[in-house]
Structure formats: C-alpha cells, structure tokens
C-alpha cells in the first residue's frame, strides 16, 4: 500500500493538524507500506495565468514556460494516482482552506488525469478505489457549520477526482477547549479500523 500524506499548515512546529495527521499515519501504516510525504508549505504552490491557460491547450502546443509550470503539477498528479490512501491535514484559516491547499487542488485537477468529461458533458473522477482521511482543525469554527467552507469543499474536490471514501477527523473549536478537541480527535483516530 502507498499512503500519501499531505500537510498544509503554515506552522511547522506546534501544528495540531500536523500532529494529528502523524498519529493517524502511525495508526494505519502497516509494515511494508510506502509513505509519500508532501509539505505544501515547502512547495510555495502558486497558480498563475500561465498555469491556467496551459491547462486548456494541448501538450504539443504548450510553450517551454508552460511545460516548466507543469512539472510540479505532473508530480502532484502522479503522487495522487500512485497512492491507495490519502491523508490531508488542514487547519481552517479564515473559514476556508490554506492557500497552498487550494493551489494543490487546482494543480491536481487535470483533464484526462484526475477527471474527464463524459459525452453528456458531466465530469467523472478518474481516481477510483482510494480512501481519503481529512484531518481538519480550527480555532473557533465549528466543523460542518455554515461557517466551515473547508470541509465540504475538500470532500467535494476529492469526490470530483473520483475519491468517494472520505473520512473526517476533526479537532474543531480548539480555542474554546483545546484539550477536549484534541482528545476527541485522538479518539476518532483510535476508532479507525
């Protein structure tokens, strides 16, 4: 099995989402499993007009600048395709995702790679038979409330890619009771089969 762990918190030290994702990885990893690790804060992901326009033209028509921009996108898509299990840790920043996580999703959304258009115009995700775990933390936002724009969006994006098995581990409203939130998230991790 290949496990793809993606951390998106801007905080390297003292990040609750990173710490919980590490606990989850230790819980589900079996001897012989391979881990692909991606720290989105290290990559400084960025989507420009060049990237966006390059996604709409055939590879043979792309400039050298387009091709260079696609090296990272190709790598992200490859990591997703290779993996059986995906762990994404993300704090809620201003009610939504970290900018690097949004850019990761934009760079991974590739026609013919992670999704395709069917003859009727509807989209179909191409990344089937994968399990995703979302480790979501927040200071004050209640998960799945009208203020949480991260969790439903990220679940939608993964479904869009074809990943239908998505489980959420949450440590929300940590500013109100940090210990309680962390313990509840740790219990959710312990209960994963």
UniProtKB/Swiss-Prot annotation:
FMN binds at residues 9, 15-17, 137-140. Its EC number is 1.6.5.-, 1.7.1.17. It is an enzyme of class 1 (oxidoreductase). InterPro entries: Flavodoxin_fold, Flavoprotein-like_sf, FMN-dep_NADH:Q_OxRdtase_AzoR1, NADH:quinone_OxRdtase_FMN_depd. Binds 1 FMN per subunit. Keywords: Flavoprotein, FMN, NAD, Oxidoreductase. It catalyses: 2 a quinone + NADH + H(+) = 2 a 1,4-benzosemiquinone + NAD(+); N,N-dimethyl-1,4-phenylenediamine + anthranilate + 2 NAD(+) = 2-(4-dimethylaminophenyl)diazenylbenzoate + 2 NADH + 2 H(+). Its cofactor is FMN. One of its GO terms (molecular function) is electron transfer activity. Belongs to the azoreductase type 1 family. Quinone reductase that provides resistance to thiol-specific stress caused by electrophilic quinones. Homodimer. This is FMN-dependent NADH:quinone oxidoreductase. It comes from Pelagibacter ubique (strain HTCC1062).
């Amino acid at each position: 099995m290949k496990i793809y762990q993606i951390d998106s918190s801007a905080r390297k030290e003292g990040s609750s989402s990173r710490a919980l994702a590490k606990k989850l990885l230790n819980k589900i990893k079996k001897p012989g499993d391979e881990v692909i690790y991606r720290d989105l804060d290290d990559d400084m992901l960025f989507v420009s007009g060049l990237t966006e326009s390059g996604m709409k033209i055939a590879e043979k028509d792309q400039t050298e600048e387009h091709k260079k921009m696609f090296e990272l996108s190709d790598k992200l898509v490859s990591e997703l395709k290779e993996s059986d299990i995906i762990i994404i840790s993300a704090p809620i920043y201003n009610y939504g995702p970290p900018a690097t996580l949004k850019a990761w999703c934009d760079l991974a959304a590739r026609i013919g790679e992670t999704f395709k258009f069917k003859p009727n115009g509807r989209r179909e995700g191409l990344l089937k038979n994968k399990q995703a775990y979302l480790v979501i933390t927040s200071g004050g936002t209640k998960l799945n409330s009208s203020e949480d724009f991260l969790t439903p969006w990220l679940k939608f994006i993964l479904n869009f890619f074809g990943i239908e098995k998505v489980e959420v581990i949450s440590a929300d409203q940590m500013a109100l009771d940090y210990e309680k939130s962390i313990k509840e998230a740790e219990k959710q991790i312990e209960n994963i089969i």
